[in-house]
């Protein structure tokens, strides 16, 4: 929680951690103004009287420096830059607290630090635009992000009756029920609607793209999208906390994204290429990280929308990321909320 959203936390920084950075930045900024006023003497040439050893020592500790900082190390830095160093130290400490055998926690911490995992937390809750989560959805999504127990106890999964854990790992892998399909369809529709609004004339779930079968490699087909070729965007969501990906995800951020991307490529890329179609897997992790190719395509869609509507490109792309992030976490919450483990009821036999 003490690390910013961009590093996998909730952005609830501790004032005691960042106070030295705020004070040092303020003093140094004021000294620069004094220097401009008085001229001549360079008040920041020396360290004495500018920042005391107590301040420099506290800031050094907050940033995790092995040797005490000097004023010369800080001149020209903004408070934001100093605070980022504090945040990075907090992130390192968090990783160091994880034991050697805690593979799941390592994988989670790496996953939540990927780009865009916290977009839903930074999105204003605008109900009119569908950019909001209900309280129950927000609680489930937050617990899952922080690695807290999502359920009160383990027990049989109500969807498939297999044993479920308290953290929601089984729930995210459970193939029974329609929540995973609904999550996929909502993400697909967001990309499709954006392509429509951008005037790209997309086709949803286009049939008979490949000769000899009715496979649908394109959740969204966009004409003339890649070097004059039609592009088949195929959306999938993968959890890094499954048996197939957890060991790699505990070592490398985005391992599950690569795993799912390669599976998609091996499944349809060659057949699409033969038909002159560019096959583009759009892969996301349950925590909200996206494969580099997916990020490129979402950014490209945002740019196309901005050109067609006259919006600012950065703003249009940011709104698209917000929408995708909210939809992903809403889908996760539906999966978790419908898989609260069953517990056997109390057996009353009348015997005292």
Predicted regions and their residues:
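Conserved RecA-like helicase motor-core motifs
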Residues: 201-203
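Short Cys/His-based metal-binding microdomains
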Residues: 10, 14-17, 24, 157-187
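Phosphate-end processing signature that detects enzymes handling 5′-triphosphorylated RNA
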Residues: 217-221
